[in-house]
Amino acid sequence: DFPKLEILFNTNEDHRKIALAIQQMWQTTLGIEVELVNQDWKVYLNREMIGDFQVSRAGWIGDYEDPNTFLDTLRPNRGNNKTGWENKKYDDLLELANSTNDTEKRYNLLMQAERILIDEMPIVPLYTYVRSYQLSEDVKGYFPNYLDHHHPKYIYLERD
């Protein structure tokens, strides 16, 4: 029998729905008993920081458009690596990737690092945020981005 698992999540209705869905799927499909542990933000962050969890619902939105924005979060001593996971080869590949000016070589090194991450699975990506946009063709200078930040300085109307 698989031992009972706890899923830690912070107080937020969307996070609660995700935790409930995981609980239901794991119990129904895998027969794993899952206890949901809801904590306010400060307690949740503290428990994550000290590693006081079995499974934790966390999130990350890439703050720049590059694979490194996600890969770098799982290096040791990074503020977002709450997993305790470390892999020297992974770290070495990221160091090499970030020290080369050869784009093809860099992406190959990042791909090798990502393969290690996929093989060892210290995290389980569940979903990505999506947004729907409807813009007039007259709107110029507006480009979708991960953080959904749009400086009005660069957005303007241009009528044909």
Feature map (PLM): residue ranges:
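Ligand/substrate-recognition segments at binding pockets and active sites
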Residues: D1-G62, T103, R131
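Extracytoplasmic/secreted proteins, especially bacterial periplasmic and envelope-associated proteins
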Residues: D14-M25, V43, D66-T69, K89-L96, ...
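Conserved, well-structured core segments
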Residues: P125
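Sec-exported extracytoplasmic/periplasmic mature domains
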Residues: Q24-I32, M49-F53, P76, E95-K105, ...
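Preference for short coil/turn "hinge" residues that link or interrupt alpha-helices
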Residues: V37, Y64, R78, I116-D119, ...
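A glycine-rich, aromatic-flanked flexible loop/lid motif
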Residues: W60-Y64, T83-E86
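Short, solvent-exposed loop/beta-turn-alpha elements that line the ligand-binding surface or hinge
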Residues: D1, R47-G51, T69-S99, T128-D160
